[in-house]
Curated annotation (Swiss-Prot):
One of its GO terms (biological process) is glycogen biosynthetic process. This is 1,4-alpha-glucan branching enzyme GlgB. Its EC number is 2.4.1.18. It catalyses: Transfers a segment of a (1->4)-alpha-D-glucan chain to a primary hydroxy group in a similar glucan chain.
């Protein structure tokens, strides 16, 4: 049995320096050594007394294939000839206390289907990709100045087979991708696909960070799924959890009988609410494990982005009852983002962060954490609280709908209507809306209208597009039978039209991260709970006027100040009958009245629909947006541009 030498291990790099290809050393690799084909097993267990490899090939006898310690810092390795792909195995670890524990391989790229927990030998290097066109197109676009609509989903509960079993990665490619294309989503965001033992953890409590969960098939099957997404122009974002991991006996927890991947200090090690433990982000070997893992998913699975989970829990730790910043985590996140963007400058790194930590999406060289997007949790919480309030009382919390614009350009934001808000008794988005059946649908259409016209990229959890009535049930699939009901079909039609309008309307996304992209017309009409604003594109003539009415009242001849174009057309009204509304729409072309109003040089008079959003577009009567008197239209603005990145 041959042994890897210290040069192969790159000992100094793994233990003391940045080494982001640790998956090339550790794990189970099919190789030929001394003219014999077999598997090289390598693992880091710094406090193990002895190590061995066990599996069906030796009847799980830990006395047969003893590993050799090849570095003082605890790297163990062994080559076993004649072992083939798909062989299952674990590491048997004799602890310093004299106990023998059995662990899955932290670097395994494949694992048994739960409830079994062994690792599986698998050659991950053979998939032939067909997504060069996708890569070329992605590099031609600026992620910051493009439309972004993200469909968040849980792979196991989007849709199930008639017998209740799960679709495979390949079957989901056939089922999901046409649906996503039909709805014109630009990306899908999948809740964690790393190997995890408990279905109801939704993947957030992982045991195998390098192993795509075998619930849905092999690593090649997932590669095929991503390849097909790219073929149809869909980016793939994965939820990724570098902050904490589960305590299942076969996983990373107390890997060699002592805290190895987690902090030693119990005060900062444990997450009592989740029942997990925190990664020791101050330890070089752990950083190399995690950052190598991020690059592994990028290189082997061609992932387009990560949504980094629970960043707030990483940035702060509650030690001895006092909330303190975790400098290990701050340093780690900066190092992570630098490594990711060095690999792919067009990658999406999104922080799920509910804190007010500054400069989350600023580059590290400017003192930031280095992400390029952050979920706008403040917007989500304020807007949903406002929508859940009875309409007649909304005027008393008017500022919840305007406050977000005070900080909308402090970070690059994604507006999330995510899974977190439609589970654990929080109700579905539709059922959060107060009032009767009609009112609920009208207000959800209104919410979506405000969502798509507010600055920031968009994310919606599955089922929201057709008005899922029940909250998310993670052990079942979506209520697809709701399409049998008229109001849900109307909702679905409305959503598809709204997202199509968003994608073809540059003012709704081109300046998402610049103050020049948004201007209030009237932010202060709390008595009627009506908001009006302008969304602006790169060109002065690219402007849309948006009016939102958050009560059930209808208003005729309502004055709205507008940029001085000669005419406006209403291009979308959420109260249209084809969407299930009452039909209070503005069918005719709206002629501007040359009288200043709302700090604009002109105004129009429109019908304001109940619980409705109306989007107006200026009619460009001449090239260059000139009016009949020959002057050129300008949009009034008292703000300056501050783009990000």
């Amino acid at each position: 049995m041959s042994v890897i030498n210290c040069e192969e291990v790159k000992r100094d790099e793994f233990h003391t320096e940045k080494y982001y290809e640790s998956y090339n050393i550790f794990g189970a690799h099919i190789v030929t050594e001394d003219e014999m084909r077999g598997v090289r097993f390598t693992v880091w267990a710094p406090h193990a007394k002895a190590m061995s490899v066990v599996g069906d090939f030796n009847e799980w006898d830990y006395e047969q294939h003893k590993m050799l310690q090849v570095t003082e810092e605890g790297i163990w390795s062994l080559f076993i000839p004649h072992i083939e792909e798909r062989e299952i195995y674990k590491y048997a670890i004799e602890t310093m206390a004299g106990d023998v524990i059995f662990k899955a391989d932290p670097y395994a790229v494949y694992a048994e289907v739960r409830p079994n927990t062994a690792s599986v030998v698998f050659d991950i290097k053979g998939y032939e990709w067909n997504d060069k066109n996708w890569s070329r197109k992605k590099k031609k676009k600026s992620v910051y100045k493009e439309a972004m609509t993200v469909y968040e989903l849980h792979f196991g509960s989007w849709k199930k087979k008639e017998d209740g079993t799960l679709y495979s990665y390949r079957e989901m490619a056939e089922e999901l991708i046409p649906y996503v294309v039909e709805h014109q989503f630009t990306h899908i965001e999948i809740m964690p696909l790393v190997e995890h033992p408990y279905d109801r953890s939704w993947g957030y409590q992982g045991t195998g960070y390098y192993a795509a969960t075998s619930r849905f098939g092999t690593p090649y099957d997932l590669m095929h799924f991503v390849d097909e997404c790219h073929k149809y122009g869909i980016g793939v974002i994965l939820d990724w959890v570098p902050g904490h991991f589960c305590k299942d006996a076969h996983g990373l927890y107390l890997f060699d009988g002592t805290p190895t991947y987690e902090y030693k200090d119990k005060d900062v090690q444990e997450n009592p609410v989740w029942g997990t433990v925190n990664f020791d982000l101050g330890k070089r070997e752990v950083r190399n494990f995690l950052i190598s893992n991020a690059l592994f998913w990028m290189r082997y699975f061609h992932i387009d982005g990560f949504r980094v989970d629970a960043v707030a829990n990483m940035l702060y730790w509650n030690k001895e009852g006092q909330e303190q910043s975790n400098e290990h985590a701050v340093s780690f996140l900066r190092e992570l983002n630098e490594a990711v963007f060095a690999e792919d400058e067009d990658f999406l790194m999104t922080a799920e962060d509910s804190t007010a930590w500054p400069l989350v999406t600023a580059p590290t060289y400017e003192g930031g954490l280095g992400f390029n997007y952050k979920w706008n949790m403040g917007w989500m919480n304020d807007v949903l609280k406002y929508m859940e309030c009875a309409p007649e009382y909304r005027k008393y919390i008017h500022d919840k709908m305007t406050f977000s614009l005070l900080y909308a350009y402090s970070e690059n934001f994604i507006l999330p209507l995510s899974h977190d808000e439609v589970v654990h008794g929080k109700k579905s988005l539709l059922n959060k809306m107060p009032g009767d059946y009609w009112d609920k649908f009208a207000q959800l259409r209104l919410l979506y209208g405000y969502f798509f016209t507010h600055p920031g990229k968009k994310l919606l959890f599955m089922g929201g597009e057709f008005g899922q009535f029940d909250e998310w049930k993670d052990l079942e699939d979506l209520d697809w039978n709701l399409h049998d009901f008229e109001m849900h079909r109307y909702m679905h039609d409305y959503f598809k039209e709204l997202i199509a309008l968003y994608k073809r309307s540059k003012p709704l996304w081109q300046l998402d991260h610049s103050r020049e992209g948004f201007q209030w017309i009237d932010a202060n009409n709390n008595e009627q709970s009506i908001f009006s604003f302008i969304r602006q594109g790169d060109k002065q003539e690219d402007a849309l006027v948006v009016v939102c009415n958050f009560t059930k009242a209808t208003y005729e001849n309502y004055k709205v100040g507008v940029p001085d174009f000669e005419y406006y057309n209403e291009i979308l009204n959420s109260d249209a009958e084809q969407y299930g509304g009452s039909g209070q729409v503005n069918k005719k072309r709206l002629k501007t009245i040359q009288e200043p109003y709302h700090n604009q040089t002109a105004h129009v008079e429109i019908t304001i629909p109940p619980f409705g959003v109306s989007i107006l577009r200026p009619v460009k009567t001449r090239k260059g947006s000139k009016k009949q008197d020959g002057s050129k239209t300008k949009v009034r603005s008292n703000v300056t541009s501050r783009g990000k990145r």
